[in-house]
């Protein structure tokens, strides 16, 4: 077991390739695509991102969700319409995302507002999922209290039997969200804590870039 007295000594030097302005792209999503591919080649779950939302009192909440689609303008994730995150988004669509690729000394932070994609788009993605995953979506009322894991498993097995030779119906509560991106910050660890940070901010459809002090 790690002794609490030793936690303050947990540190390492971040040794990375140079990250300069000349490495940047005009559209931050092009750099995002490059970094995502490099993360994919080196770490598990590179599409896992920490989504931050706030409730009606201003209390922030965070959780990992999976990036499922992106293009030159946006990124997309999916969830239950009745989940805690979706309820927060319904009240306040402003969110923040973080891709925590600390294993390769990188991090990307994204801010913006989200809006629902069409039912047709959500349905298209839903049916790319493995059938057992489709069934588990029906079995779980996300974020609600359950008495035990057994209750959830029994419901799943009952539904699995029901849809053994049938298609799983599309859940009316399954929703996808697109992000209208306002800013993207690319961070790369540097030796002696001289990290590199570049912030893209959008103003009237144009991206402006600034280097930030670490």
UniProtKB/Swiss-Prot annotation:
Protein's UniProt keywords contain Cytoplasm: no
EC number per UniProt: 1.4.3.5
Binding site for substrate: 11-14, 68, 125, 129, 193-195
Binding site for FMN: 63-68, 78-79, 84-85, 107, 142-143, 187, 197
Taxonomic path: Bacteria, Pseudomonadati, Pseudomonadota, Gammaproteobacteria, Enterobacterales
Record-linked InterPro entries: Pyridox_Oxase (IPR000659), Pyridox_Oxase_CS (IPR019740), Pyridox_Oxase_N (IPR011576), Pyridoxamine_oxidase_dimer_C (IPR019576), Split_barrel_FMN-bd (IPR012349)
Co-factor binding details: Binds 1 FMN per subunit.
Keywords: Flavoprotein, FMN, Oxidoreductase, Pyridoxine biosynthesis
Pathway the protein takes part in: Cofactor metabolism; pyridoxal 5'-phosphate salvage; pyridoxal 5'-phosphate from pyridoxamine 5'-phosphate: step 1/1; Cofactor metabolism; pyridoxal 5'-phosphate salvage; pyridoxal 5'-phosphate from pyridoxine 5'-phosphate: step 1/1
GO annotation, biological process: pyridoxine biosynthetic process
Reaction catalysed by this enzyme: pyridoxamine 5'-phosphate + O2 + H2O = pyridoxal 5'-phosphate + H2O2 + NH4(+); pyridoxine 5'-phosphate + O2 = pyridoxal 5'-phosphate + H2O2
Chain's role: Catalyzes the oxidation of either pyridoxine 5'-phosphate (PNP) or pyridoxamine 5'-phosphate (PMP) into pyridoxal 5'-phosphate (PLP).
HAMAP family, alphabetized: PdxH
Cofactor(s) named in the record: FMN
Family: Belongs to the pyridoxamine 5'-phosphate oxidase family.
Highest taxon, organism lineage: Bacteria
Protein name: Pyridoxine/pyridoxamine 5'-phosphate oxidase
